[in-house]
Regions:
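Phosphate/dinucleotide-binding and metal-coordinating scaffold of catalytic cores
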Residues: 1-250, 254-342
Length: 342
C-alpha cells in the first residue's frame, strides 16, 4: 500500500528496511545470503556498510526470489557446475565460524540471493529449481532429517507444501531440499512467479515480533478474497502451535500472484521445523498469546475471521491427532526438545 499505482513520487521510510519499499526489500538477501554478500564484498576490498540499497539490488540482479529482476547487474561471483553437498556444508560451517572459505565464489553463486538464517544454496535437481539447506552452527546436525519429517507430517495434516526431499550425506542423516514455488517450468522455459512476504506487504520487520494470527487471517482474506485460503492459514497456524514451530515471523508467510486468475493466493508452506523465537515464544501471537497458546486461543482466532466453531475445532483436532501420530509418538518432537535444552 506504500506504492499505489498513481503518478506520484513516493519516498520510503528508513525503518524497517533501511530506506527500501517492502516489495523491493523482499528481493534482498538476509541472514545467510547477506553474510555471503558481505564476505564477497570484503574480499573485493569493499566495505559492506558503504553499499546502499540500489547497489545491493544490482548485486541480486536476476538471481533473486520471486519475479523481480534488477539492472544493471553487478556480478561478483564465478560459476561452477559440480555440487557436492557435504563439501558445501563444510564450507558453510567455516563461513559461520570465520571469514575464510575456499569456495566463497561457489557458495555466493549458489546461495547469495537467498534469505533465512540457515545456510542454503539455490540449485537444479532433475532440471528443476530447488533450495537445499545445511545445518547452522547451533543446529542439531540432523536438522535436515527433522525438517523433512516435519514436511511429511505437514502434508498429512492437509497443508500445501512444495515437493521435499532428503538428500544423501556421508556426514549426517541428510540435507533438506525443497522445490522452489517461485519458479515453474513452462514449455521448455522457466516462468518466474511474483511473490510477496507478509513482511513486505505490511512493511514490518521480521526480526521484531509484532504480528498476531488474527492479522494474518484478515490479510489473507483481503488479499485473496477466498475463505479457502483463510482456512489454509488457519490450518498452518494450528500446525505451528502443535509442532513447536515458534519462528513463525512475517517472512515465513508468503503470497503468490496468479497471472491467469488475476489474484493472490497463499504460497505453499515452508520453514516448518522445531524452533524458538525471542524469549521462546511464537514470533506471531495466537490471539495475543505467544508463550503457551491453547486450543481456546486457536478457536478464538477462527471465530474472529468467521470460521465456524465446528469446522475450526475439527481442523485443529485433525492436525493435532496427525502431529501426535507422526511426531509425538515417534519421539521426534521429544528429541528436538531435548536437543534444544541439553
Amino acid at each position: 500500500r506504500s506504492l499505489p499505482l498513481q503518478k506520484k513520487v513516493y519516498i520510503p521510510k528508513i525503518v524497517p528496511f533501511d530506506g527500501a519499499f517492502g516489495v523491493f526489500a523482499d528481493s534482498l538477501p538476509d541472514g545467510w545470503g547477506r553474510l555471503l554478500v558481505d564476505r564477497m564484498l570484503l574480499r573485493e576490498h569493499i566495505n559492506p556498510h558503504e553499499i546502499d540499497i540500489l547497489n545491493r539490488l544490482a548485486i541480486v540482479g536476476e538471481t533473486g526470489m520471486g519475479a523481480l529482476t534488477y539492472r544493471p547487474v553487478h556480478k561478483i561471483q564465478s560459476e561452477k557446475a559440480q555440487i557436492e553437498y557435504d563439501r558445501l556444508a563444510a564450507e558453510c560451517r567455516r563461513i559461520l565460524e570465520t571469514e575464510y572459505s575456499n569456495d566463497l565464489d561457489e557458495l555466493f553463486a549458489l546461495g547469495g540471493s537467498s534469505g533465512g538464517a540457515r545456510p542454503k544454496i539455490l540449485t537444479k535437481i532433475d532440471g528443476e529449481d530447488w533450495i537445499v539447506k545445511f545445518p547452522a552452527s547451533l543446529d542439531d546436525p540432523n536438522i535436515g532429517l527433522v525438517e523433512y519429517q516435519y514436511s511429511l507430517c505437514a502434508k498429512k495434516c492437509g497443508i500445501e507444501m512444495a515437493e521435499t526431499r532428503l538428500l544423501p550425506s556421508r556426514q549426517c542423516e541428510g540435507y533438506f531440499g525443497t522445490k522452489r514455488f517461485d519458479r515453474v517450468a513452462l514449455n521448455g522455459h522457466v516462468k518466474r512467479i511474483h511473490m510477496l512476504s507478509v513482511s513486505a506487504i505490511l512493511e514490518v520487520s521480521h526480526r521484531i515480533p509484532s504480528l498476531d494470527y488474527n492479522t494474518l487471517m484478515v490479510l489473507t482474506l483481503e488479499l485473496t478474497k477466498d475463505y479457502s485460503e483463510v482456512e489454509k492459514m488457519y490450518r498452518l497456524m494450528c500446525f505451528n502451535v502443535f509442532v513447536h514451530n515458534r519462528d513463525d515471523h512475517s517472512k515465513n508467510f508468503t503470497f503468490l500472484y496468479d497471472t491467469e486468475k488475476g489474484g493472490w493466493r497463499l504460497a505453499p508452506a515452508y520453514d516448518l521445523t522445531y524452533s524458538n523465537s525471542i524469549g521462546g515464544e511464537h514470533a506471531t501471537c495466537i490471539n495475543g498469546n505467544g508463550k503457551d497458546p491453547a486450543l481456546a486461543d486457536i478457536l478464538i482466532v477462527a471465530d474472529k475471521i468467521g470460521i465456524s466453531k465446528s469446522k475450526a475445532k475439527r481442523i485443529a483436532e485433525q492436525v493435532q491427532d496427525t502431529v501426535n501420530d507422526e511426531l509425538v509418538k515417534t519421539g521426534i518432537l521429544h528429541n528436538m526438545r531435548y536437543s534444544y535444552f541439553r
